């Protein structure tokens, strides 16, 4: 790889790191190519990607981005996973993959520029996705007006039932 290729790669990585909401550093030593392809496909489905490059190039690319807090973890065989939208999906994919593959070890992560540990990444993976949370919020908002309408319609309904009972009572007295 010549100097121009390295500069182009650093530029691409810098752009990726700058747009990333979630960045994860993992050790992939000993994984088969087919296993890397598997996680690459799974990550692509949730607007994320996994990149492998030399650690010095990763450090240069991380400068000035939210991923810079992870620069100390760029040692050994390093893969960097970047997510550009909802961080929950990639966190789920990575924790499930790491659970099934001993040789894939998550070192650390950065969520919007703040370094988080593996335990917080696993907690993030347990959250429902953004779409599910929005659905739950919408359901809650929908239930409030519905309940209010039921309460408000209960008063006239009770009044009408009372009038009907009074009418029935008068009719029975008249017989």
Curated annotation (Swiss-Prot):
Record's protein name: Large ribosomal subunit protein uL10
Function: Forms part of the ribosomal stalk, playing a central role in the interaction of the ribosome with GTP-bound translation factors.
GO molecular function, one term: large ribosomal subunit rRNA binding
A Pfam cross-reference name: Ribosomal_L10
CDD domains listed in its UniProt record: Ribosomal_L10
Membership in a protein family: Belongs to the universal ribosomal protein uL10 family.
Gene: rplJ
A GO cellular-component term linked to this record: ribosome
Keyword RNA-binding attached: yes
Keywords: Ribonucleoprotein, Ribosomal protein, RNA-binding, rRNA-binding
Organism classification: Bacteria, Pseudomonadati, Thermodesulfobacteriota, Desulfobulbia, Desulfobulbales
GO biological process: translation
Stored InterPro entries: Ribosomal_uL10, Ribosomal_uL10-like_sf, Ribosomal_uL10_bac, Ribosomal_uL10_bac_type
Assembly with partners or alone: Part of the ribosomal stalk of the 50S ribosomal subunit. The N-terminus interacts with L11 and the large rRNA to form the base of the stalk. The C-terminus forms an elongated spine to which L12 dimers bind in a sequential fashion forming a multimeric L10(L12)X complex.
Signal peptide from the UniProt entry: none
